[in-house]
Amino acid sequence: MDQWRNRVCASWVLLLSLLVSALPVDAQHAAVEPSPTASPSPTPAVFSPQTLADLKRLQQEALNSDYAYRQVSHLTNNIGPRLSGSAQAAKAVEYVASELKAIGCEVQLEKVMVPHWVRGEETAALVQFFGQAPNTTQKIVLCSLGGSVATPKNGIEAEVLVVKNFDELKSMPREKVAGRIVLFYYPFDKQMAAQGQGGEAYGEAVVYRSHGPSEAARQGGVACLIRSVGGADYRLPHTGLTDYAKDAPKIPAGAVTAEDADLIADLVRQGPVKMKLVLTPETLPDAESANVIADIKGSEHPEQVIIVSGHLDSWDLGTGAIDDGAGVAVSMEAANLIQKLRLRPKRTIRVIAWMNEENGEAGSKQYAKDHEKEISNHFAAMETDGGAGHPTGVNIKANPEVKKNFAPVAAILQESGAGILRLVEHCGADIEPLEKAGVPAF
């Protein structure tokens, strides 16, 4: 087994075991107060030699295990894309529940009603532009944004207006935008991503996917396109959810490949460009689904819950291996290794495979509602949904003193190249309701 690939499992399991075995009960509200007479020590007293030894055991076991990879393989190869409401999403719920029962977890399915949006025909072509060869058109590769409404059956044919950002759009008189297809031409900042700020780069670009269609509609646009968000090009469109504002008309919305967005922008600089656009997605009635909840009961504080999680649903244009099959599999691996090594967590470990993170977050919202009276007993919540490459460390949304208490674990994680601890304002979409309720998030 390639140990480099398994480091993500090792890092996640070490973090989980720290929270299970090391932090005091009140760690989420205050740091451990040192004795006034004690000598300074780089290791807080909450870490016993046995705890640190268990962390090392977990690290080695995780590096040598292929359990998580086998789970991802089944989710992607045997089930496939898992868009909320689909048959594949339902099969994934059954599979993950069965696997977690097999390793000895107490498993239940908690009902969630999820949006059921389905993709339809997606075609576009440039039918008129400066310098056009006679009797030709230019094919444009694109996909509908999640939740998009459809064009009329025969499509829309309109001039394309290219804008760089919201400010440029809002500065234009309405008559210049009305009746046009608006293309937000905002390239993903690959340099920022290369410097370790991929999340920030993604966030800067994704606002045009989330809010672009409504902003274009307010100005009279008949459809909205964005330059696909992300660093991978290869003429592949990148989908994601668009968030229609309640006070704006809903217009068809899509993502154009980076290469085709570049083409359109270049042609528009030379003269007017007209596009024929056909998108036929459909929103069906909400469908019944479930969050998968799997517990390893705590030996001393079973009422206190530590969540380790990933989201089981995925977009339909890929197999959902990275987003977020890997996150679900790593969470399952954490439980698997704790059971395999016969460790007895003090607090209840709750593995959650969330449903509907991608286009509604219905699963996390329903969990927060169903467990509202128990939120005060949620000791910590962890989510992995940031990719499946080599991990660099752990994000922390908690009391800053908690970061200091993590120093011994960071030292062990660094042996796998994943020892960076970073205080952040937000850790994950699915644990956000718990974050807002004051639960420490990782």
Describe the predicted segments one by one:
Residues L55-L63, N77-A87, A158-V163, M172, ...:
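Second-shell loop/turn segments in exported
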